[in-house]
Amino acid sequence: GIIVKQEIIADLSRITEEEQAILDGKTEVEKERYSSGQKFVMDAGKLLERGKLIDIRPHTRFIRFPAHSHNYVEMIYMCQGSTVHTINGERIELKTGELLILNQNAVQEIEPAGRDDIAVNFLILPEFFDQTLRMIGAEENQLKDFIVGCLKSGEVPLCYLHYRIADVLPVQNLIENLVW
């Protein structure tokens, strides 16, 4: 409901320690916080609690994230406002209520989000999808192709899915329940 959504937004709107450092003048993303190698690859080992297959964290605002990839699947849900992403060179504006899912082959850049641009990132290890694939069964569809691509290494044709679902109430309620 609306009250729950307002509580979620209020909770997610709080300035984090990382965001405060940015507001105090830090001009670049602290790559060590997210990545351990030379290349800027977001590392689940640094971001996910040990033993978890999936976790949720608020998107860091006020700073541009340079081109990076992930060693996990990232699902971004736009709670309020919008964010601009460039995925493998293609510009995507993620608006309130929309969902963007990236596999490990996606190279992502993110423009700075403002104070009222509230997004949550779901970090999902590829192993999470093993069971999902068994449940989907044999029929061919875009989601299945995407999940199979998440489990493979190397180039796959479909590296992101963008769902414009702001008007799909059951999906909105499901995501709200996941976040809260």
Predicted region positions:
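Generic serine detector
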Residues: 13, 24, 35-36, 69, ...
